[in-house]
Regions:
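Conserved N-terminal phosphate-binding loop of PLP-dependent enzymes in the Aspartate aminotransferase
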Residues: 2-431
Length: 431
């Protein structure tokens, strides 16, 4: 069995995501990363199939991203955004407004995806208050959604997956509808349309906004659904004065096969959140964008200030590397690149369907999922991953990859074949 470096101090003192302290199994010490590889302290090279939780889309140690940060570092690493501005923030804003769905016209820079969602919810609520709709105080979402781990972001996550019961009555109560029916190419049935319509008829007087991950539900289940659902949601939000919030933090910048997943449905949201790939994984950074109508109604109200102001808002380093990251993404012909990635992953992972213990294999854009019938035993599975030279981070029954866009066909084939071997070995093991 392959062994890799761990660290006693880390295990005793450093809390990791969704883990106990000490963890139930040790964290692997990473020394460096380059291209599509992360390298452990003892020199083991692993193909990163996760893009570091979907952010490092250009791989690691990219010369253009490095250069952008070094150049900006020579000018200033940070300056407060209250009362001041700077060219990197302006440049990034112009670049974003030239590529996001039509109608989005105002930008709030945030620290992280979760904070971008908090700002989106706050923005929608403040807009409804300013628009003299005082009963619209709550939010709606679907089951199997995930929007982050800060307080109000958690409140709109799936109530079961989001562990709402753990926090008792302190977590704000929101409205939930059934998860969108699975199947990207599937038509909505009449009964499904009627159910969503009826929900709006019954509850819209209370709803400030409806938040959803367009087309791909990420950490709530890696589910792909029809653009028809998103189109119906846009229609119902319009009819009932409900703000449509599209969370593109995971899907934005090409992951779904379009630059933004909203494009699959040919619609624009009222508010959109972006993050992860925004800086190519170099810095924690995100943004919340809204229409000019929302910005104007808030800004011309009795309470004209949007009440949020992170210390590191509009960080110049983050803005500079985000500009470079977007330039790279636009240079890729992202639709062609992700379509090719989807084709390779579909072909290479198809044999997994025949494995006893696999429920489904599905791919869309640069996302591939092997759904098992039972939850993964992480210590066992992680050991097999390391033995086979790849890094993947399953959750529950879901074994999935979101590789960097810079991966070659040969490298992607190697990743998929290794993952297939891991899944096969895992399912046929004898404990």
């Amino acid at each position: 069995m392959t062994t890799v470096s761990t660290n006693d101090f880390d295990q005793q003192h450093l809390w990791h995501p969704y883990a106990s302290l000490p963890p139930t199994y040790p964290n692997i010490v990473i020394d460096r990363a380059d291209g599509i590889y992360i390298v452990t302290e003892d020199g083991t090279r692993l193909i990163d199939g996760m893009s570091s939780w979907w952010a490092s889309v250009h791989g690691y140690n990219h010369p253009k991203l490095n250069a952008a940060m070094i150049k900006q570092l020579g000018k200033m690493a940070h300056v407060m955004f209250g009362g001041l501005t700077h060219q990197p923030a302006i440049n990034l804003g112009k670049k974003l407004l030239s590529i996001v769905p039509a109608g989005l016209d105002a930008i709030f820079y945030a620290d992280s995806g979760s904070i971008a969602v908090e700002v989106a919810l706050k923005m929608a609520l403040q807009y409804q208050i300013a628009a003299k709709r005082p009963t619209k105080q709550q939010f709606a979402s679907t089951h199997s959604g995930y929007y982050g781990d800060t307080w109000h972001a958690m409140s709109v996550c799936d109530p079961i997956n989001g562990m709402h019961s753990l926090y008792g009555k302190q977590l704000p109560m929101q409205h939930f509808v059934a998860a969108p029916p699975m199947g990207f190419e599937r038509d909505l049935t009449q009964s499904e349309r009627e159910a969503l319509t009826e929900f709006f008829v019954k509850n819209s007087d209370q709803l400030a906004g409806f938040i959803i991950e367009p087309i791909i539900q990420g950490a709530g289940g890696m589910r792909f659904y029809s653009p028809q659902y998103f189109q119906l949601l846009r229609q119902l939000c319009d009819e009932h004065n409900v703000v449509l919030i599209a969370d593109e933090i995971a899907t934005g910048f090409g992951r779904s096969g379009k630059l933004f997943a909203c494009e699959h449905a040919a619609i624009s949201p009222d508010i959109m959140t972006i993050g992860k790939a925004l800086t190519g994984g170099y810095m924690t950074f995100a943004a919340t964008l809204c229409t000019r109508t929302i910005a104007d109604i808030i800004s011309q109200s009795d309470y004209p200030s949007l009440m949020h102001g992170p210390t590191f808002m509009g960080n110049p380093l983050a803005c500079a590397v985000a500009c470079a990251s977007i330039d790279l993404i636009l240079s890729y012909d992202i639709e062609a690149r992700t379509a090719n990635m989807q084709s390779v992953m579909e072909q290479q992972l198809a044999p997994a369907v025949s494995l006893n213990g696999v429920a489904e294999v599905r791919c869309l854009g640069a996302v591939a999922v092997i759904e098992l019938q039972e939850a993964v035993n992480m210590p066992v599975f992680q050991s097999l991953l390391i033995e086979n030279g790849i890094w993947v981070r399953p959750f529950g029954k879901l074994v999935y990859i979101m590789p960097p866009y810079v991966i070659t066909d040969d490298e992607l084939t190697t990743l998929c074949q290794a993952l297939l071997k891991v899944v096969s070995s895992y399912l046929t093991r004898k404990d």
